């Protein structure tokens, strides 16, 4: 997508002298001796990374060097589906065929050895690659080796940064970079991150890129006010210090703002989709324009060069789906380069033009040996003009956002079971199981027009289709793995509609089994809820003991749900058996007071309005009056200030004060031994269940919104708002991609003086997992089950946007309003509300947020299945760990990497100074020896975050900052398998393993 209107340290260069031979394609797998006692091998190779710049073109140090970067920006779905874009179908919607782009580019590169091109989207490139002949693949490998075809970024997609979870970002980057490593070796390893189109940039994204080994980061979009200031102060390029916990330069990343977003300069677009005049150098032609073009280009280059600090400037030569006829581009660029450079001798012009790449441009900046300013916040929210804040997409298509988050959860369970069961997961009694389709579908969903909700409706439908089709082979894999690990061949069932209380097996069977798998590194006590048809059931735990259970009636539908608490070990499962008992009349609990409570929390509701009015933490003796209700903003369709309307990208209400969905709610109180609920009905299209389970330290709000009525001609943007008397001084806090927390201040930006044109939309920020407010004593935190937009628009208040339905397009290229066909879309979701003392709040919200993202997975079976192995007794409980992980450590990744290799990531999930009461912010030491029960680790190699290079061989360019020298790590030393995790540190390993014979 193109255009803001979507149309047309240590001293720099510490390793610059090392330009020796490239590392071979086997760099990730150097020969290691067998390990009698397990250890991790660290080798110091501080200059290996600089070798990758040896193919860069020569520059002229005494001139202004203009780096022309030919590129195409190929959205992995937007106006057309992924397949439609790749094959060039429906060009009446948008003329775009990626397969033809790559065909044409390769041909044009071969025609002139000085030409260069960068490619980004590996989802497309890998598909194209598989269709090529061996001869073509050999040619492409040589182009890559010579640096004429270079990959930037290297992820499966160019992911969104506002609505993505860090675990899914890491996964999609790993998928793309692994393809490049296995296909081209280190020759194809990208050196720069390239996010030219995402609509704002998160600090966590920069941190992840730095930990993946990138030398720099280029992007196109930033707030128009921010860009204006940066141009004046020569801060279009700086070092982004992207973590407050990781020691510099671990999360430091050199960052460059491209001068023209990612488009060619005006008048210099020579794609077949453009209308600019080609270069006519024949003086005899009446269309001769070469002299004027050269004059124009020299002025353009000189003016642009004044905005940057070195004798180098970059021009992006390409845009959306360009280069389908690459010759039109390259032929004119060849002429431009020749004509401009001829002026050096003819007229003494001090401008040198060359084909280049972002990495080669970065290399020259590094050699300039300058000191750079440091940025510590992020680039949200993004506005491309007054009244034009791109904060609507934080909440657009909430159903797809939830499906993506559920699929991430499901994929991690699938990956873990594949790792625990080994080859038995892939081939077993249920067929061929495979995690790859869901892994690829999830990677596609991270694209900046997918989970963001900014594609057309039929494309959003196709994204959902890809996820659904990816689940199926994972279900087969999980069935094989569970049979192998449990010793029972059951007819496993996966009820995908449990969120709307539909599961045929539990609603019809007299007896069934419930297998609960826990992907967390510690045991969980988790409430199982299943739709049933009777009122009395007997539930037995894995040891055959009867456990308490309840059947509650859902007032809105008069259906029943069975509840029981399941205790599930770390990275393992428990099997519970359920059987019907003779029916009894359900006992109703009556209470005049609208109060629900357990041993930790009490929630009171206003008897006159039915709204939540008070929350009390009984454990910490905290009482907070809090009112929660639903409101809606009337979506702007344009006014006398601006024609800008609310749309898929843009949030713009036509007034600052939202309207009540209802001032009161009809209520129904449900009290049972295992749950207490207040059912609130606000309107025909908005309801909520406020719920408390025993031993639960948070209040659960399960909301249902939609279909949003628009018969009155008004688009509506629905929020859930919490109002308190907390003195919050204009401050609130949001997560960055589900990881570190950033402080937000109303009507304020840390690096420039804000002219606020939209008091509501201009204060919205992305919320991936949590938002909170605090007065320094008490903290009110709300956890989300998907990405949403959120804010605190007045002191003591906190709001989250849960749904939007709009009647007008926002003129950013989609060309259709965010208005699902038919009656509209109804959406269900959850907010978890925590009230804590500030010093203990992090311990609560960190661990609860982890459980939300990696929730237990329920698998059902009829029971009575045959034994998997006749000689082995079945087991009804299993843990993949011999000992639990400490609470501050998260098992981020456990997945198959090769026939006898696993990918393992361990993460410290607390920030520095975040928790002092339980020392959860302290470093944690783990012994990986015999940690896992299903396999033995025989060899361990530590890698960078995306697992595409050994950490021992990874080296990044070094930069000097205005904050002073940054000490770089000393050469690594061999250490034992006992590893230490610092706060917010993620360590990644490739583990050679041997599976236990009996699983």
UniProtKB/Swiss-Prot annotation:
It is found in: Lysosome. Residues 1-25 are annotated as: Disordered. SMART domains: Alpha-mann_mid. Binds 1 zinc ion per subunit. Glycans are attached at residues 134, 369, 499, 634, 640, 681, 755, 919. It catalyses: Hydrolysis of terminal, non-reducing alpha-D-mannose residues in alpha-D-mannosides. GO terms for biological process: mannose metabolic process. Residues 1-50 form the signal peptide. Pfam families: Alpha-mann_mid, Glyco_hydro38C2, Glyco_hydro_38C, Glyco_hydro_38N, Laman-like_dom. The keyword Flavoprotein does not apply. The keyword Protein transport does not apply. Disulfide bonds join 269-274, 495-503. Residues 591-621 form a propeptide. The active site is at residue 197. Processed into 5 peptides of 35/38 kDa (A), 11/13 kDa (B) and 22 kDa (C), 38 kDa (D) and 13/15 kDa (E). The A, B and C peptides are disulfide-linked into a 67 kDa complex. Heavily glycosylated. Some sugar chains are of the high-mannose type. One of its GO terms (cellular component) is lysosome. GO terms for molecular function: alpha-mannosidase activity; carbohydrate binding; zinc ion binding. It is an enzyme of class 3 (hydrolase). Its cofactor is Zn(2+). It is linked to Defects in MAN2B1 are the cause of lysosomal alpha-mannosidosis (AM). AM is a lysosomal storage disease characterized by accumulation of unbranched oligosaccharide chains. The disease manifests itself by head tremor, aggressive tendency, ataxia, failure to thrive, and early death. Homodimer. Belongs to the glycosyl hydrolase 38 family. This is Lysosomal alpha-mannosidase.
């Amino acid at each position: 997508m193109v255009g803001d209107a979507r149309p047309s340290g240590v001293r720099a260069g510490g390793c610059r002298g090392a330009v020796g031979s490239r590392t071979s394609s086997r760099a990730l797998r150097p020969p290691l001796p067998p390990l009698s006692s397990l250890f991790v091998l660290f080798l110091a190779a501080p200059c290996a990374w600089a070798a990758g710049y040896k193919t860069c073109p020569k520059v002229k140090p005494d001139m202004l060097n203009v780096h022309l970067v030919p590129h195409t920006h190929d959205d992995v779905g937007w106006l057309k589906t992924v397949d439609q874009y790749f094959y060039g179908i429906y060009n009446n919607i948008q003329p775009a065929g990626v397969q033809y782009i790559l065909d044409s580019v390769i041909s044009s590169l071969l025609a002139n050895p000085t030409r260069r091109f960068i490619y980004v989207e590996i989802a497309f490139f890998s598909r194209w690659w598989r269709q090529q002949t061996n001869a073509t693949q050999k040619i492409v490998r040589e182009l890559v080796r010579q640096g004429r075809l270079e990959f930037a970024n290297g992820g499966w997609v160019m992911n969104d940064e506002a609505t993505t979870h860090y675990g899914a970002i890491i996964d999609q980057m790993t998928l793309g970079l692994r393809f490049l490593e296995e296909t081209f070796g280190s020759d194809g390893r990208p050196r720069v991150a390239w996010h030219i189109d995402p609509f704002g940039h998160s600090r966590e994204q920069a941190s992840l890129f730095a930990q993946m080994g990138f030398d720099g980061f280029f992007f196109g979009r930033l707030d128009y006010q921010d860009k204006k200031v940066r141009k004046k102060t020569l801060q279009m390029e700086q070092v982004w210090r992207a973590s407050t916990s990781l020691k510099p330069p671990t999360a430091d990343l050199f960052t460059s703002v491209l001068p023209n977003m990612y488009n060619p300069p005006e008048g210099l677009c020579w794609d077949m989709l453009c209308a600019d005049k080609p270069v006519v150098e024949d003086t005899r032609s009446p269309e001769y324009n070469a002299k004027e073009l050269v004059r124009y280009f020299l002025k353009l280059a000189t003016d642009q060069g004044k905005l940057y600090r070195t004798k180098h400037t970059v021009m992006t030569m390409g845009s959306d789906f360009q280069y389908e006829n690459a010759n039109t581009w390259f032929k004119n660029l060849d002429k431009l380069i020749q004509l401009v450079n001829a002026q050096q001798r003819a007229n003494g012009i001090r401008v040198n033009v060359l084909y280049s790449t972002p990495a080669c441009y970065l290399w020259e900046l590094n050699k300039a040996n300058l000191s750079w300013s440091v940025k510590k916040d992020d680039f949200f929210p993004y506005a491309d003009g007054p009244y034009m804040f791109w904060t609507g997409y934080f909440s657009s298509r909430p159903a797809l956002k939830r499906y993506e988050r559920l699929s991430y959860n499901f994929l991690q369970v699938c990956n873990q079971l594949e790792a625990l069961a080994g080859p038995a997961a892939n081939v077993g009694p249920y067929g061929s199981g495979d995690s790859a389709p869901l892994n690829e579908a999830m990677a596609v969903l991270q694209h900046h027009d997918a989970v963001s909700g900014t594609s057309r409706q039929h494309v959003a439908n196709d994204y959902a289709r890809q996820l659904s089709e990816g689940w199926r082979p994972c279900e087969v894999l999980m069935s094989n793995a569970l049979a192998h690990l449990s010793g029972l061949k059951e007819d496993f069932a996966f009820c995908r509609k449990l969120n709307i209380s539909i599961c045929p097996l539990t609603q019809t069977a007299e007896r069934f089994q419930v297998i609960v798998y826990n992907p967390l590194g510690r045991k969980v006590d988790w409430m199982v809820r299943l739709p049933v048809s009777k009122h009395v059931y007997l539930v037995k735990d894995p040891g055959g003991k009867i456990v308490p259970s309840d059947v509650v009636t859902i007032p809105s539908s008069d259906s029943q749900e069975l509840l029981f608490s399941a205790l599930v070990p770390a990275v393992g499962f428990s099997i519970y058996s359920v059987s019907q008992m003779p029916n009894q009349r359900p006992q109703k609990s009556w209470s005049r007071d609208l109060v629900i409570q357990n041993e930790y929390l009490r929630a009171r509701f206003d008897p006159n309005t039915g709204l939540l009015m008070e929350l009390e933490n009984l454990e910490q003796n905290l009482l907070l009056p809090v009112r929660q209700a639903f409101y809606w903003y009337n979506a702007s369709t344009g006014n006398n200030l601006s024609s800008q309307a609310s749309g898929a990208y843009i949030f713009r209400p036509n007034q600052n004060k939202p309207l009540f969905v209802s001032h009161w709610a009809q209520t129904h109180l449900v009290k049972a031994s295992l749950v207490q609920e207040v059912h609130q009905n606000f309107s025909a299209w908005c309801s909520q269940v406020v719920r408390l389970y025993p031993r639960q330290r948070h209040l659960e709000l399960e909301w249902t919104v939609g279909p949003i009525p628009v018969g009155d001609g008004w688009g509506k943007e629905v929020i859930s708002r919490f109002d308190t008397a907390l003195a919050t001084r204009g401050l609130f806090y949001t997560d960055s991609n589900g990881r570190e927390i950033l402080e937000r201040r109303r009507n304020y930006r840390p690096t420039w003086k804000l002219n606020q044109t939209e008091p509501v939309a201009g204060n919205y920020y992305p919320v991936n997992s949590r938002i909170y407010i605090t007065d320094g004593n008490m903290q009110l935190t709300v956890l989300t089950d998907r990405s949403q937009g959120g804010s605190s628009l007045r002191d003591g208040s906190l709001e989250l946007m849960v749904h939007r339905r709009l009647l007008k397009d926002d003129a950013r290229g989609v060309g259709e309003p965010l208005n699902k066909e038919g009656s509209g879309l109804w959406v269900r979701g959850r907010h978890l509300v925590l009230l804590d003392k500030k010093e203990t709040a992090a311990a609560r919200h960190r661990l609860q947020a982890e459980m939300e993202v990696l929730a237990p997975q329920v698998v059902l079976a009829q029971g009575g299945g045959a034994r998997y192995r006749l000689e082995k007794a079945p087991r009804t409980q299993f843990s993949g760990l011999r000992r639990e992980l400490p609470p501050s450590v998260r098992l981020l990744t456990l997945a198959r990497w090769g026939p006898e290799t696993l990918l393992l990531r361990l993460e410290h999930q607390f920030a520095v100074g975040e928790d002092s009461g339980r020392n959860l912010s302290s470093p944690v030491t783990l012994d990986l020896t015999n940690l896992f029960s299903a396999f033995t680790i025989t060899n361990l190699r530590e890698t960078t975050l995306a697992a595409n290079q050994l950490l021992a061989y990874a080296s990044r360019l070094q930069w000097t900052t205005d904050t002073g020298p940054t000490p770089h790590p000393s050469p690594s030393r061999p250490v034992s398998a006992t590893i230490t995790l610092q706060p917010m540190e993620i360590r990644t390993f490739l583990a050679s393993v041997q599976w236990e014979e009996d699983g």
